[in-house]
């Protein structure tokens, strides 16, 4: 018995007249007056289901085949034949249909309807991958993930597993989830009345990580070129289409590198993964272009063929001021540019992806390298047409005295970062890196307007179901 994924049958990998068994779920069943049933069967391997033509002379035709409903799982054996119908080249002439699992009540099955709102699907996140849209998102997400790993492997980078539990705040923002095994009903206290974290599991305050960057720096200062790719957590009370409490980050870190080096790396990586998804998941992208965002494919094709523009933050602010545009958020030097500012630069002024560099130090993190002007740091953001910021990065401050001064300036005790300071004490080197929010990348590729719909089980304020 040869089991075959639906994708292999539909793509023509298997010869006509060969006998195969496909395993999957019923998308739909249609019965003809001629005593034939047409089953649309999907297994997730590709966007399209395969049509199985089932004759009424099968032993279980009346008592099982005619009772199949959306969601039932089946194994169908038959011969691959050329399809006379429009839409696909091959179908299955069934000789055996085995029902593996029934849907208990077809009337109340949450996925019974052919179309559901995106909002409704969030309420049934455990079932939503069975839909066309979320199934396509999952395949695109996988393709992008594999392409990222492949890109860095080909470039000679080592993947580093950054810890999820940390005592460090990489962003200095303080919006962190605390990790504790203390009894919340009976907290141990110090003489001063504060919670005594010496009694906790790790003997100190610990949190879920907001970034793997600091740990990646340690490994870059030994392996030269590394990257992390894993979940990160922010306790931001933000109910927006761009924010999640749990999301994935891609964070390369490069020793003996400056800001321009990682700016080029960011451009090369984005173009590489976009080319990969255009080649490998064309069927899913065509669905997104048809149903979600008409520009889904065009946007990616234009992106990979564009030369990135580069502009200093100070010049970008002047461009915004000279535009004559009335923005919702006023423009002045020193602001952290909002999405409307970023999109104006990428979509209307440069009409291409743009890298903005050298931001004011007061709106950036403590670890970013101070520029000679004393006002700006060697930071960058990559702005993409259609979404705005998609990558943020910087050259790291490798000079211990400057790093210490910067931490004190921002209210961070250097002694609490002693291990991070050691990287500057023992063989310091210029190094740089960036962070890519993976869900924003998936959202950009698919055209899905909300990051809650491009991660399997979204974690947001007041919501941690499933």
From Swiss-Prot:
PROSITE patterns, A to Z: AA_TRNA_LIGASE_II
One Pfam family it belongs to: tRNA_anti-codon
Gene Ontology CC entries for this record: cytoplasm
EC number: 6.1.1.22
Swiss-Prot/TrEMBL catalytic activity: tRNA(Asn) + L-asparagine + ATP = L-asparaginyl-tRNA(Asn) + AMP + diphosphate + H(+)
Main location: cytoplasm
Record localization: Cytoplasm
Keywords attached to this entry: Aminoacyl-tRNA synthetase, ATP-binding, Cytoplasm, Ligase, Nucleotide-binding, Protein biosynthesis
GO molecular function: asparagine-tRNA ligase activity; ATP binding; nucleic acid binding
InterPro entries noted in UniProt: Aa-tRNA-synt_II, aa-tRNA-synth_II, aa-tRNA-synth_II/BPL/LPL, Asn-tRNA-ligase, Asp/Asn-tRNA-synth_IIb, NA-bd_OB-fold, NA-bd_OB_tRNA
Biological-process GO terms, alphabetical: asparaginyl-tRNA aminoacylation
Family named by the database record: Belongs to the class-II aminoacyl-tRNA synthetase family.
Subunit field text: Homodimer.
HAMAP family xrefs: Asn_tRNA_synth (MF_00534)
Protein name, as recorded: Asparagine--tRNA ligase
Gene: asnS
């Amino acid at each position: 018995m040869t089991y075959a994924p639906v994708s292999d049958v539909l793509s023509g990998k298997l010869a006509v007249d060969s006998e195969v068994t496909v395993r999957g779920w019923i998308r739909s069943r249609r019965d003809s007056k001629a005593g034939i049933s047409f089953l649309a069967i999907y297994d997730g391997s590709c966007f399209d289901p395969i049509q199985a033509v089932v004759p009424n002379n099968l032993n279980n035709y009346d008592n099982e085949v005619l009772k199949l409903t959306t969601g039932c799982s089946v194994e169908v054996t038959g011969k691959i034949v050329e399809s006379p119908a429009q839409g696909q080249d091959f179908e299955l002439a069934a000789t055996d249909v085995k029902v593996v699992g029934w849907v208990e009540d077809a009337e109340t099955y949450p996925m019974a309807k052919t179309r559901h709102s995106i909002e409704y699907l969030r309420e049934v996140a455990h079932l939503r991958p069975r839909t066309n849209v979320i199934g396509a998102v999952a395949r695109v997400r996988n393709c992008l993930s594999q392409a990222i790993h492949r890109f860095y492997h080909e470039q000679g980078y080592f993947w580093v597993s950054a810890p999820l539990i940390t005592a460090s705040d990489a962003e200095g923002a303080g919006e962190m989830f605390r990790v504790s095994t203390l009894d919340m009903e009976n907290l141990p206290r110090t003489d001063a009345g504060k919670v005594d974290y010496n009694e906790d599991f790790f003997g100190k305050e610990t949190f879920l990580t907001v970034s793997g960057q600091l740990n990646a720096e340690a490994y870059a200062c030994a392996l030269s070129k590394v990257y992390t790719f894993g979940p990160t957590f922010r306790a931001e009370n933000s109910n927006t289409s761009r924010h999640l409490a749990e999301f994935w980050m891609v964070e390369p870190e490069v020793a003996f590198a400056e800001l321009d080096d990682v700016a080029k790396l960011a451009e090369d990586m984005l173009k590489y993964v976009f080319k990969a998804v255009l080649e490998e998941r064309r069927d899913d992208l065509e669905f997104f272009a048809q149903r979600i965002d008409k520009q889904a494919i065009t946007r990616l094709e234009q992106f990979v063929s564009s030369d990135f523009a580069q502009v200093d933050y100070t010049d970008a602010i002047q461009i915004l001021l000279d535009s004559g545009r009335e923005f919702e958020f006023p423009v002045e030097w020193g602001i952290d540019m909002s999405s409307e500012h970023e999109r104006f630069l990428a979509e209307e002024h440069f009409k291409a992806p743009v890298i903005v560099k050298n931001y004011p130090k007061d709106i950036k993190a403590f670890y970013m390298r101070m520029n000679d002007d004393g006002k700006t740091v060697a930071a960058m953001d990559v702005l993409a047409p259609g979404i705005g910021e998609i990558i943020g990065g910087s050259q790291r401050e490798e000079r211990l005295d400057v790093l210490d001064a910067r931490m004190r300036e921002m209210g961070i005790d250097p002694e609490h970062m002693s291990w991070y300071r050691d990287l500057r004490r023992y063989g310091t080197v210029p190094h740089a890196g960036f962070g890519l929010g993976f869900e924003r990348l998936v959202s950009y590729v698919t055209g899905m307007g909300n990051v809650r719909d491009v991660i399997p089980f979204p974690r947001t304020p007041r919501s941690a179901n499933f």
